[in-house]
């Protein structure tokens, strides 16, 4: 009877394999868009305005004579050209030095005459040198199309957009939001990311590649508690 209750090695191996593979399937989930960067759709069709003969028609928005149509209303699309590039460096160098000394001439007569001059000298010195250097650089290029979420009275527009790309076994997320002035948009309805005010740009990834680039939970735990 005891022989049948004792688990075999193959059964234990199968159980361990199932437990190891199960978390991988549990972590797999469908990528959902971020509602904070959701597209804004155009409002209901605006009522038709009868031209009054003036050259400038407010209902047409910002449309220069020598260029094509540009985004100017809620729901309009605008393409952002990402040209982000940053580089920073910092270095520090500190050197200190300190020394001191003292000497006492002992008596040569009387009960303390057995001291020698070398027995009553003291000196100290301290030196310190520290050097530190740090540097960081980042760059991001490409294009993403966003929609106008809000138009302010002065014509400035709040834009936001998100792009999700599924490549093999991973997802790439590009999100952007910020303020754009109408005159910063060129004739092809493009605007540079460097011309976006209060810009929020993020580029993240999920999936097997992103998971492999992160430290494991056990290694992260020991790194947190390590005093070195």
From Swiss-Prot:
Q: Looking at the Swiss-Prot or TrEMBL record, what is one Pfam family this protein matches?
A: FlgH
For this UniProt record, give its keywords in alphabetical order, as a comma-separated list. Bacterial flagellum, Cell outer membrane, Membrane, Signal
- Where is this protein found? Cell outer membrane; Bacterial flagellum basal body
GO MF annotation list: cytoskeletal motor activity
A GO biological process of this protein is: bacterial-type flagellum-dependent cell motility
Question: What are the annotated GO cellular component locations?
Answer: bacterial-type flagellum basal body, distal rod, L ring; cell outer membrane
Signal sequence range = 1-26
Would you identify the family this protein belongs to, as annotated? Belongs to the FlgH family.
**What do we know about how this protein assembles, alone or with others?**
The basal body constitutes a major portion of the flagellar organelle and consists of four rings (L,P,S, and M) mounted on a central rod.
Role summary: Assembles around the rod to form the L-ring and probably protects the motor/basal body from shearing forces during rotation.
HAMAP family membership: FlgH
Q: What is this protein called?
A: Flagellar L-ring protein
User: Which organism was this protein described from?
Assistant: Zymomonas mobilis subsp. mobilis (strain ATCC 31821 / ZM4 / CP4)
The lineage is: Bacteria, Pseudomonadati, Pseudomonadota, Alphaproteobacteria, Sphingomonadales
Originating gene: flgH
